[in-house]
Amino acid sequence: MNRTLLTQALIKFLAGILLIGLLVFLPAGSFAYWQGWLLMGVLFVPMFFAGIVMLAKSPDLLRKRLNAKEKEGEQKAVVALSGLLFTLSFVTAGLNWRFDWWILPDWTVWTAAALFILSYLLYAEVLRENEYLSRTIEVQEGQKVIDTGLYGIVRHPMYMATVIMFLSMPLVLGSPISFIIMLGYIPVIAKRIRNEEIVLSEGLDGYKEYMKSVKYKVIPFIW
């Protein structure tokens, strides 16, 4: 087992728990915010087990997923905007619960939690299908176009999973106000996709043909 990789993964995992916990519970002013605990559970429990599986079976893939440093200025801006949206959404959700502004019914929260878990399953399938998947936009040595499985339906199934994941999170937190804020993620990710397709079409053999054969980017028949 790669102890360095394990250490890096654990540090990022624990830092993520601490960061999300602060963003959710500090504005809420209480640990009684059960929707916050639900989000922590559906977010970090599957993440923990996925990390163990990747560490054991696909350490190179885990290493790529841990690397979030973008090289291009445009993508750095996309990452910064995404971080701002997350911060505003989580803080607003905590304040929404604390001051009882507009709380969603429990059935909506649990339905959103189920959608979140579904998005994790989609994400796991994408990781299984594409060994070249990284968090940064780049063309890797020996990379090939993947056009089977989910990639035969949409060109960016990872973003299909993340759109479901990110839009369901504020609903898990019971905050429609946070959901409205998180809708800003759609134009942000659209900007990232445009840039990514430019990079791939210029640097990855066969990608232009793939774009012609698979029409939809993220959501079948819609986007």
What kind of region is each of these model predictions?
Residues 152-160:
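Histidine-centered phosphotransfer motif of kinases
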